[in-house]
UniProtKB/Swiss-Prot annotation:
Pfam families: BACK, BTB. It comes from Mus musculus (Mouse). This is BTB/POZ domain-containing protein 7. Keywords: Developmental protein, Lipoprotein, Myristate, Nucleus, Phosphoprotein, Repeat. It is found in: Nucleus.
Length: 1130
């Protein structure tokens, strides 16, 4: 019996013997073939149900009325009525809608196949071959030793004698217990490993080692001539059971419990004995193995060996009835559960038989015997016998036994596997069950389980009709139970005279059906003008009309059979085979008459939520990937139980479960289900998860083990982690590994292209130099670069810069200054992942020298981390319009400086820059001119233009530090829109490719009236971003220089500034306007010794910055009524 349904035998199991006719079908009248549950053919065969009314018709007398004849004919043609109703429904539909309905049915059919496989899954039972292999390896209960090449091989006399004629003759010469027999093998080339493999073959029927000598035909012929050719293992074991040669244990049964406890009372009280072998019963049952080992420890076994008598085991017949003993032994030797052996053995009345005689019941049925034997198998821990009994019970399910099997399997001591098969039979045969008296004996729980299924084989109208009848029958039973005992059994009792329908209490009937009617899919009742539905609404059993009667937002009517927007919660139609067949037939006809396959393409509505917060809430259940939930900070250790009652399995078992889950995900059947069920990935994932749980013997409630294994094993990796997940700090957030390899960066170099487009730029972020972070980065494997991610990715990247980046060489560990607070690493920070600039390093030194108390430090940028989709929405507005002209300007800068400069330093590289939003309306040129007269220090946070994103350069009257104070003439970090004045160009490394080679035609802005380009009038912000500089050898010197002038740069927060605006305005206070020009010239000349034209461009750029400062400050004045704050793009 395999662990999954794909390895199961078809209808009957080889372990089940006896009635061959009952073995031809698995459950009821259908077999569990996949073809029988698809939409290609009828989902379930009910042919025998159509013959039943015809048989009754033959037996009716000639006095039957014409009305009854019409009723019987109408019942026999029920399936034809269903097809007609579906055809009438689809008569006015568009061909695309019919195709959508058929696709929905196909998706449901794929889910049904997975559900069927999950219902058939159960743990794999150990076979005779596996138990015999363990018996040879563990060597318990051995009784003879073979000596070969000075090596002792403990073996079992009975097994070798039954399997090999050579050993049968050899062992008969030494019958005593523990005899040592020296082996003398004449076949050449047999060594000790090969001899051990030969013994393993006699135990299991297979060689236990891979040896090329066993492929040699000559050696095999010589071995067969000397030892003989053994029969198949099952044949020899059956012969051993029949003849019981060399038996060494006797099973005795007694109904006197005191005798069993005393062990050694009057032997006349013992009944007939059964012979067996210790090796076999201990190998198959842990119960007998522990019993025999306990006898060895207590010394009782030595007494039996001394007296040369078989070991006697006395069993209490109230626990293990004697009539089942032979069936148990037969299964131990043959792996077959044959109840025919039960009727051949003498029956000593068991407790169940006594109860049956007292109650006046007939003999036990085959299913009842299997139920009783199932409990004995669980007691003996004999799984093969238990699963064989389950097969017998499942095969016996029919209309007559359905109620008994459902009740037995619903109990805690029943079989959950049998219960799933009984519920499946109820769902498949519900149309037949509803028309029989068995339907009224069903409990409410069983009915509720059935009507919740998407695979119910009944129409919604019949379900509603017979549910009401079932409720009326239950109400009548209540009335009968409430009547006085005096009337019971008389002509005036309710059971005799009956109760009319109008006499039933509607309120009480509604209370009985209150938990069942909500699961009737009223929107799918056919015909639309159903009398059953209208009657139920008149009686008040159904209070709300179907959604077809409710108008939608468009003013039309919603189609409850299809997925539509603004149509409320969608409930898929049941996979009722007559409806499915007729829908496919109608689609085939419409395709031939109206259209071809190309015109059938349409957008399928799925269950993907429209709101972002719904995604995070649904991820742990909906995602088919394994989710990762770290242990919270207040939790000291991972939980030891799941679902409050199930112990967490061992790590080895957990890894096997995850491996099995990954294996199932890659099967063609599961992939087809994922493809056909758009937006239903949660259902597909859950089906394969519970299948794996059942294969490993765990309850369905333990699904969290597979949905979130990292919660229970936080230190383990299960094969689906990505670099982004490993960068998270434990206990910070919950992450689901949903992105695939095509849409997720898996290398450090790909982080260079990240441009979090949230204006203004984020405040400083300090990645820590922790050894764990370095180990994780070192552990990432290099993967081939994937194609550029689409714009749907949370962080839009600069595609043109992908190929002009080289991986940075690992530099020295970063040095942190005193007072600088170490913060966790930021995945969205490009410079923090290996690339530093002169501006970033100098700004870090300036900030460290002029450090402010922690209360004034800006908060860490977490918006990109928590809401990447909002960042995506802001960035996509300007990504296309801004990138092309910006890169064009940068390309010209790179080329000119590379020609003028002799050798650019490595840190003067082109850095990916931040994009801003340009969707607002631009003010006219006249408004810009007027705005120059008003100068303010406060930037407009709601203005996302280029000028608004840059602080104004101070006027000549203010202190303006030179580039040596932390400024840099290269490309700006956060904008591509700044062109250097007077021909100053950016510098690229020799190994880098200019973006001009990547970008073709560039769009340029129209020039302004004063001759300068339009974008030159908007001087951008130059924020001092504090970053860690891993590759800055001149960092200490820069820090010392800025430290000498540190107090001059410290500026406290003004009264009108807030946490958002502090640090974004000019950081050069007017109190220090007098600065030595010699110091400025000295530092400028020291930095620009290699290039004279570079110095000239610096002075010209200073003038332009000062002129642009007055323009931008006046234009952004918040006090002017003409220039109100612009509307935020967020």
């Amino acid at each position: 019996m395999g662990a999954n349904a794909s390895n199961y035998p078809h209808s009957c199991s080889p372990r089940v013997g006896g009635n061959s006719q009952a073995q031809q079908t698995f459950i009821g009248t259908s077999s569990y073939s996949q073809q029988g549950y698809g939409c290609e053919s009828k989902l379930y065969s009910l042919d025998h149900g159509h013959e039943k009314p015809q048989d009754k018709k033959k037996r009716t007398s000639g006095l039957a009325t014409l009305k009854k004849k019409f009723i019987k004919r109408r019942k026999s043609n029920r399936s034809a009525d269903h097809a007609k109703q579906m055809r009438e429904l689809l008569s006015g539909w568009d061909v695309r809608d019919v195709n959508a309905l058929v696709e929905e049915y196909e998706g449901t059919s794929a889910l049904k196949e997975l559900s069927l496989q999950a219902s058939l899954a159960r743990p794999e039972a150990r076979t005779l071959q596996k138990d015999m292999a363990d018996l040879y390896e563990d060597k318990y209960c051995t009784d003879v030793d073979l000596i070969f090449q000075e090596t002792c091989f403990p073996v079992h006399r009975a097994i070798l004698a039954a399997r090999c004629p050579f050993f049968k003759t050899l062992l008969s010469s030494s019958p005593e217990y523990g005899a040592e027999i020296i082996m003398d093998i004449s076949t050449a080339g047999i060594d000790m490993p090969m001899f051990s493999a030969l013994l393993h073959y006699l135990y299991t029927g297979e060689f236990g080692m891979e040896d090329s000598r066993f492929q040699n035909v000559d050696i095999l012929v010589q071995l067969s001539e000397e030892f003989g050719t053994p029969n198949p293992l099952d044949v020899d074991m059956r012969g051993l059971f029949d003849y019981m040669c060399y038996y060494d244990v006797v099973l005795s049964f007694s109904s006197d419990s005191e005798l069993v406890e005393a062990f050694g009372g009057n032997q006349n009280c013992l009944d007939e004995e059964l012979k067996a072998h210790k090796a076999i019963i201990s190998a198959r049952s842990p119960f007998f193995r522990n019993l025999l080992q306990r006898r060895i420890r207590t010394g009782e076994e030595i007494t039996d060996r001394t007296l040369r008598t078989p070991t006697r085991i006395i069993l209490d017949e109230s626990i293990i009835p004697k009539k089942y003993a032979k069936v148990i032994l037969h299964c131990m030797y043959t792996d077959v559960v044959d109840l025919s052996v039960l009727h051949c053995s003498p029956s000593v009345g068991s407790l169940s038989e006594v109860q049956a005689l007292v109650a006046g019941k007939p003999n036990m049925t085959r299913a009842e015997e299997a139920m009783e034997l199932y409990h004995i198998a669980l007691f003996l821990e004999f799984n093969m016998l238990a699963q064989g009994c389950e097969d017998i019970i499942a095969e016996s399910i029919s209309l007559d036994t359905l109620i008994a099997v459902l009740k037995w399997s619903s109990h805690p001591y029943g079989s959950k596997w049998v219960h799933r098969q009984a519920v499946h039979f109820l769902c498949e045969e519900l149309s037949q069950v509803m028309t029989s008296d068995v339907f009224y004996e069903l409990s409410k729980d069983h009915l509720l389980t059935a009507i919740q299924s998407d695979y119910l084989q009944a129409s919604e109208q019949d379900i509603l009709k017979y549910l009401i009848k079932w409720g009326e029958h239950q109400l009548m039973k209540r009335i009968a139970d409430r009547e006085p005992n005096l009337l019971s059994g008389t002509a005036h009792s309710v059971n005799k005279r009956g109760v009319k329908r109008r006499d039933l209490d509607i309120e009480e009937l509604r209370e009985i059906l209150s938990s069942l009617l909500p699961f009737v899919r009223i929107e799918h009742i056919l015909p639309i003008n159903s009398e059953v539905l209208s009657d139920a609404m008149k009686r008040g059993l159904i209070s709300t009309p179907p959604s077809d009667m409710l108008p939608t937002a468009e003013g039309g009517k919603s189609n409850a059979w299809l997925r539509q927007k603004n149509a409320g919660i969608y409930v898929r139609p049941r996979l009722f085979s007559p409806y499915v067949e007729e829908a496919k037939s109608v689609l085939d006809e419409m395709m031939v008459e109206q259209t071809d396959l190309v015109r059938l393409r349409m957008v399928r509505m799925s269950n993907v939520p429209d709101t972002l917060y719904m995604v995070s809430n649904a991820m742990p259940q909906c995602c088919h990937m394994i989710s990762h939930q770290q242990i919270s900070s207040n939790q000291s250790s991972p939980p030891s139980v799941v679902a409050n009652e199930i112990p967490v399995p061992r790590l080895l078992i957990m890894k096997d479960m995850v491996r099995r889950l990954q294996e199932l995900r890659h099967t063609e059947q599961v992939q087809r289900a994922y493809a056909l069920n758009c937006g239903e990935g949660a259902t597909v994932s859950y089906e394969i998860q519970i299948r794996v749980l059942r294969e490993f013997g765990l309850a369905d409630a333990a699904a969290e083990l597979l949905q979130n294994p990292h919660k229970f094993f936080p230190d383990e990796r299960f094969g689906d982690e990505s670099p982004l997940l490993t960068m998270r700090q434990p206990g910070r957030c919950r992450v689901n590994s949903t992105p695939t390899a095509e849409t997720m960066f898996t290398d450090l170099d790909s982080f260079v292209a990240f441009h979090p487009p949230l204006p203004p730029p984020p405040p400083p972020y300090h990645p820590p130099a922790t050894p764990i972070h370095n180990q994780l980065k070192a552990g990432w494997k290099q993967r081939p670069p994937s194609h550029h991610p689409s714009r749907s990715f949370s962080y839009p990247c600069n595609h043109s810069l992908f190929h002009c980046r080289t991986a940075p060489k690992p530099g020295p560990p970063p040095v942190y200054l005193p007072g600088v607070k170490v913060a966790p690493p930021d995945c969205t920070n490009t410079t923090g992942l290996g690339r530093q600039t002169v501006a970033a390093a100098a700004a870090a030194a300036a900030a460290s020298a002029a450090i402010i108390p922690e209360k004034q430090v800006c908060p860490q940028p977490v918006l990109n981390d928590l809401m990447p989709d909002i960042a995506m929405g802001v960035s996509t507005l300007s990504l296309k319009d801004r990138r092309l002209p910006e890169l064009a300007a940068d390309t010209e800068l790179c080329q000119t400086v590379s020609e003028a400069g002799t050798g650019p330093p490595q840190h003067l590289s082109c850095i990916p820059q931040r994009h801003t939003n340009t969707s607002r309306k631009k003010p006219t040129l006249e408004q810009k001119a007027d705005g120059r007269e008003n100068q303010q220090e406060y930037p407009d946070l709601y203005d996302f233009s280029n000028a608004a994103c840059r602080p104004s350069t101070p006027a000549p009257g203010r202190h303006s530090p030179s580039p040596a104070h932390g400024r840099y003439f290269g490309p700006d970090l956060y904008s591509h829109n700044k062109a250097s004045p007077n021909g100053l160009k950016s510098v690229y490394l020799p190994g880098q490719t200019s973006p001009k080679k990547q970008e073709d035609p560039r769009r340029e802005y129209p020039p302004s009236p004063d001759g300068h380009p339009h974008r030159q009038k908007r001087e951008p912000i130059r924020l001092d971003v504090v970053e860690q500089p891993p590759q800055r050898p001149d960092f200490p010197s820069a820090a010392s220089e800025n430290a000498s002038h540190g107090p001059a740069h410290v500026r406290a927060r003004t009264a009108v500034e807030t946490d958002l605006t502090f640090g974004l305005t000019s950081n050069r206070p007017p109190s220090h306007s007098a600065c030595s020009s010699e110091v400025l010239e000295e530092r400028s000349s020291r930095r620009l010794t290699d290039s004279e034209p570079l110095g000239h461009g610096a002075h010209q750029r200073n003038a332009d910055l000062e002129r642009g400062d007055s323009i931008s400050r006046g234009r952004r004045s918040p006090s002017k009524p003409d220039f109100l704050y612009k509307k935020s793009a967020l």
